[in-house]
């Protein structure tokens, strides 16, 4: 732990952890080619107030909580902030056919958005939608964030499918969502970073129009899509690329924006090319197509809109010219990302060429496909040094 924290402090000042709340690992569990596949990413919460017990190193009472606090303390001592990815848009209870863990039994009509016929609205794409702006649910979310801030001393939260947090109980988008304003102005959370994934699975896309109250930042999905296309040679969108590199001022505070007063300028913009969803940066320049066969869905899962380029050969290669071009493209991407106005974010392992071998949806791959291959740090040390240089630039 100490070694990895010291390594990380050499290049970053914050780490965003994927969901660490207790979740249902057995949801949609199945066997594919002799391998047992479980929910790995953690986006099916069961309890918002407890860390996932399976992350503990020993089967001891509250070992997971103690070790998480030790991790956060160690990261803080190395100058690294900790941001939690939180999932308040749905739970692991699913739709009418799903399990009952908690909220269905407490008060189904209060905690979930229901149609007039009593069915579950599915703005999350996961079977149900948390009724975030109901007063009781609103208070629960606030108390949860306060709990993690006070007891675990986390520095920020990234909200998965955050546009759901701005929907009315009937599912319609609100102009001034009570929950978002409550979190923005809460005194306990005043120094905590709030980061939105400003869209949902119901078609609500709010990048540049999220109800931010000059307090929220957001993942800039437009930056990702635009720069991925531009970097692989789609020069027709050079104008949009220039806007994105210069800070997306048309969205977050600059020319031609109708939402300037809503955002806190360029600090509201989190630029990224890669995250847990989709290709790693190495795979972005090693594959033209996704290769998700190991997930067991005949390669139908995961996005087809990857905006990637394999540099002349699909997948693994021993061709020195192809490999040289791939690492040049990664350096190009890193240079653009670190030079863009806003806050840069990249996927752990990108700094030394980690690969998922073309799988762009590793939600069920708790194995070498998803695990970071630390041996690549030594093999691709020149790339790591380039990342360090650009971050300090």
Regions found by a protein language model. Name each.
Residues 17, 276, 390:
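A residue-level signal for conserved active-site and pocket-lining positions in enzyme catalytic cores
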Residues 153, 169-170, 174-348, 352-353, ...:
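Conserved alpha/beta catalytic core and glycan-binding cleft of carbohydrate-active enzymes
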Residues 1-154, 161-188, 204, 254, ...:
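Substrate-binding/active-site clefts of carbohydrate-active enzymes
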């Amino acid at each position: 732990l100490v070694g990895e924290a010291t390594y990380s402090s050499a290049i970053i000042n914050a780490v965003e952890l994927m969901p660490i709340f207790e979740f249902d690992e057995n949801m949609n569990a199945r066997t594919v080619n002799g391998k047992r596949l479980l929910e790995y990413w953690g986006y099916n919460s069961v309890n918002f107030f407890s860390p996932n017990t399976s992350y503990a190193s020993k089967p001891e009472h509250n070992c997971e909580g103690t070790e998480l606090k030790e991790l956060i303390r160690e990261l803080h001592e190395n100058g690294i902030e900790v941001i939690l990815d939180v999932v308040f848009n749905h739970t692991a209870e699913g739709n009418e056919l799903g399990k009952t863990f908690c909220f269905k039994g407490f008060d189904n009509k209060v905690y979930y958005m229901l149609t007039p016929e009593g069915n579950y609205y599915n703005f999350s794409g996961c079977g149900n939608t948390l009724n975030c702006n109901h007063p009781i649910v609103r208070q629960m979310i606030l108390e949860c964030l306060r709990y993690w801030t006070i007891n675990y001393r986390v520095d920020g939260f990234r909200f998965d499918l955050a546009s759901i947090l701005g929907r009315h109980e009937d599912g319609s988008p609100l102009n001034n969502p009570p929950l978002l304003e409550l979190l923005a102005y809460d005194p306990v959370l005043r120094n905590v970073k709030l980061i939105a994934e400003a869209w949902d699975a119901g078609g609500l896309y709010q990048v540049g129009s999220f109800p931010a109250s000059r307090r929220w930042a957001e993942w800039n999905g437009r930056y990702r899509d635009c720069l991925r296309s531009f970097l692989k040679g789609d020069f027709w969108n050079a104008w949009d690329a220039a806007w994105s590199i210069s800070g997306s001022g048309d969205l977050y505070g600059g020319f031609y924006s109708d939402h300037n007063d809503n955002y806190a300028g360029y600090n509201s913009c989190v630029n990224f090319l890669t995250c847990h969803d989709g290709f790693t940066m190495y795979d972005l320049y090693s594959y033209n197509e996704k290769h998700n066969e190991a997930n067991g869905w005949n390669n139908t899962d995961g996005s087809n809109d990857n905006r990637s380029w394999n540099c002349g050969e699909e997948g693994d290669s021993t061709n020195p010219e192809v490999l040289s071009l791939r690492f040049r493209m990664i350096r190009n991407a890193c240079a653009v990302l670190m030079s863009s106005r806003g806050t840069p974010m990249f996927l752990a392992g990108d700094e030394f060429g980690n690969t998922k071998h073309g799988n762009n949806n590793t939600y069920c791959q708790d194995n070498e496909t998803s695990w970071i291959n630390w041996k690549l740090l030594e093999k691709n040390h020149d790339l790591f040094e380039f990342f360090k240089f650009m971050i300090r630039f």
